[in-house]
């Protein structure tokens, strides 16, 4: 028959074990693998784009809040949001080829350069990244049409 001490020790361990299992996994992605996760599907003809409206998956908190606020306000007014194309390819339509990704990281910040041809036109996108508690996230995107930070200052 188990002793009282053994039963109490086992019961005491249960909450700690349950707590440990409930914690999100530690982010192990590098800034380059984060960007590859975003961009690798784009050359696939059937790919419809990343769900950038799921802002917490991609953007740092300040930019995520600005995008969400704009989407809510646009919906309330029955209008198109400021971000009316795919920010990762700077377009509403795409046919991506010759995708290349490079990253320069410095501690908790990184800059990614993504180049590709979209419908035969060479395009370069620069993404500023920061390491957050959720992993690497985008603080700004600089594209031929402008930057997200400028878009949301208007």
Which residue ranges define each predicted feature?
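N-terminal export leaders
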Residues: 3-8
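Bacterial N-terminal signal peptides
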Residues: 9-14
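Short, low-complexity N-terminal intrinsically disordered segments enriched in polar/charged residues
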Residues: 17-51
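Non-catalytic interaction/Regulatory regions outside core domains
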Residues: 24, 29, 39-40, 56, ...
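Structured segments of extracytoplasmic/periplasmic soluble domains
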Residues: 37, 41-45, 58-62, 66, ...
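Surface-exposed, charged secondary-structure patches
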Residues: 60, 64-121
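Low-complexity, intrinsically disordered terminal/linker segments enriched in charged
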Residues: 105-109, 113, 119-124, 132, ...
């Amino acid at each position: 028959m188990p002793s009282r001490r053994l039963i109490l020790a086992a019961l005491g361990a249960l909450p700690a074990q349950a707590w440990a299992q409930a914690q999100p996994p530690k982010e192990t992605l590098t800034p380059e693998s984060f960007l590859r996760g975003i961009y690798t599907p784009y050359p696939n003809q059937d790919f419809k784009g990343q769900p950038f409206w799921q802002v917490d998956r991609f953007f740092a908190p300040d930019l995520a809040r600005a995008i969400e606020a704009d989407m809510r306000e646009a919906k309330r007014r029955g209008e198109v949001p400021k971000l009316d194309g795919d920010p990762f390819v700077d377009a509403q339509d795409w046919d991506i080829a010759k995708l290349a990704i490079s990253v320069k990281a410095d501690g908790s910040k990184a800059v990614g350069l993504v180049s590709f041809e979209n419908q035969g036109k060479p395009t370069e996108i620069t993404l500023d990244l920061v390491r957050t508690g959720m992993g690497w996230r985008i603080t700004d995107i600089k594209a031929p049409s402008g930057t997200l930070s400028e878009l949301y200052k208007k």
